[in-house]
Amino acid sequence: MKGLLTLAWFLACSVPAVPGGLLELKSMIEKVTGKNAFKNYGFYGCYCGWGGRGTPKDGTDWCCQMHDRCYGQLEEKDCAIRTQSYDYRYTNGLVICEHDSFCPMRLCACDRKLVYCLRRNLWTYNPLYQYYPNFLC
């Protein structure tokens, strides 16, 4: 069910004007990890993609759980995590967030923390978890 909802949500947002930081996150994941964000991480394990529950399957999935928690903290501060966009640069392997206001800067920081974690955990990536059914979590 998680996979179908995520796919429906992604397709609905795939019109030319995709709101928020989703394009930034996709771009950041692909630049830092070299992997296709949607294909490789959109449905991975128990936490990558929208929502999450249970125990993370590996280091890669743990990164996504940490990212969910980071976003949860921003929601508690009334940041619009699904619609807020932000600017960043990727230079010499570093992600540099470029905002002065709280929500865009913190959203970018959550995403930066995720992509660095995913890069550190590339060795844990297991294709068996790429389209993992949520009911097994």
UniProtKB/Swiss-Prot annotation:
CDD domains: PLA2c (cd00125). This is Phospholipase A2 group V. It is an enzyme of class 3 (hydrolase). Ca(2+) binds at residues 47, 49, 51, 68. Pfam families: Phospholip_A2_1. Belongs to the phospholipase A2 family. Expressed in peritoneal macrophages (at protein level). Expressed in heart, skeletal muscle and white adipose tissue. It comes from Mus musculus. Disruption phenotype: Mutant mice show increased high-fat diet induced obesity, increased visceral fat depositions and exacerbated INS resistance. In a model of systemic candidiasis, mutant mice are deficient in clearing C.albicans in kidney, liver and spleen, resulting in increased mortality. In K/BxN serum transfer arthritis model, a well-described mouse model of inflammatory arthritis, mutant mice develop severe autoantibody-driven arthritic response characterized by increased leukocytic tissue infiltration, pannus formation and bone and cartilage destruction.
